[in-house]
From Swiss-Prot:
HAMAP family: RimP. GO terms for biological process: ribosomal small subunit assembly; translation. SUPFAM superfamilies: YhbC-like, C-terminal domain, YhbC-like, N-terminal domain. This is Ribosome maturation factor RimP. Its main location: cytoplasm. GO terms for cellular component: cytosol. Keywords: Cytoplasm, Ribosome biogenesis. Belongs to the RimP family. It comes from Coxiella burnetii (strain CbuG_Q212). Pfam families: DUF150_C, RimP_N.
C-alpha cells in the first residue's frame, strides 16, 4: 500500500468526524521540503476557517501516529475547480465534465489524455470521450487525474 493511501486511511476518520469529505491526499517533495497535501470538501464548498480546523485535527492525529519520517509541511485546502480525481465515485460524480488523466504506462505511445468523462462501470473502468475516439482505462492504470476547467465554453 502506498504511503499516501496509508495516510488517507489514518486521517479519514478525523476529517469525517468533523463533517467533511476527505477527497484525497498526496505526499511529495518540493525542493528539500516534504509536503503532505490534503484535500477536503463538503456540499457547498469549504472555507479557510474550516480548513484550519481540519488541519489542527489532522496534526493531532499525525503527532500521535507519526507516520511520516522527518519534517514535513501539512497543507489542507479545498480540491479547487480543477480538483483531483482519485476514486470511482469521484469520476461518477463528474460524468459530463472534462478531465485530464496521466497513465502509469503509455498507451499507443501516449501517457496523457484529455476528454469528457462519459461512464464508470462496476469494475471501476473509466470511459473518456476524446476528440475523435473513446478511451477506456481502469483506475489502476491512472497515475494522476483532475478535472479541467473550460472557460471558453
Amino acid at each position: 500500500m502506498s504511503q499516501a493511501r496509508t495516510l488517507h486511511r489514518l486521517i479519514a476518520p478525523a476529517v469525517e468526524a468533523l463533517g467533511f469529505e476527505l477527497v484525497g491526499c498526496e505526499l511529495f517533495r518540493r525542493g528539500a521540503t516534504t509536503i503532505l497535501q490534503v484535500f477536503v470538501d463538503k456540499p457547498g464548498g469549504i472555507g479557510l476557517d474550516e480548513c484550519a480546523k481540519v488541519s489542527r485535527q489532522i496534526s493531532a492525529v499525525l503527532d500521535v501516529e507519526d507516520p511520516i519520517r522527518g519534517r514535513y509541511t501539512l497543507e489542507v485546502s479545498s480540491p479547487g475547480l480543477e480538483r483531483p480525481l482519485y476514486t470511482a465515485n469521484h469520476y461518477r460524480r463528474f460524468i459530463g465534465n472534462k478531465a485530464k488523466i496521466r497513465l502509469r504506462e503509455p498507451r499507443e505511445g501516449q501517457r496523457q489524455f484529455r476528454g469528457m468523462i462519459v461512464a464508470v462501470d462496476n469494475e471501476e473502468q473509466v470511459t473518456l470521450q476524446l476528440d475523435n475516439k473513446i478511451l477506456k482505462v481502469s483506475l489502476g492504470e491512472i497515475e494522476k487525474a483532475n478535472l479541467i476547467t473550460d472557460f471558453e465554453g
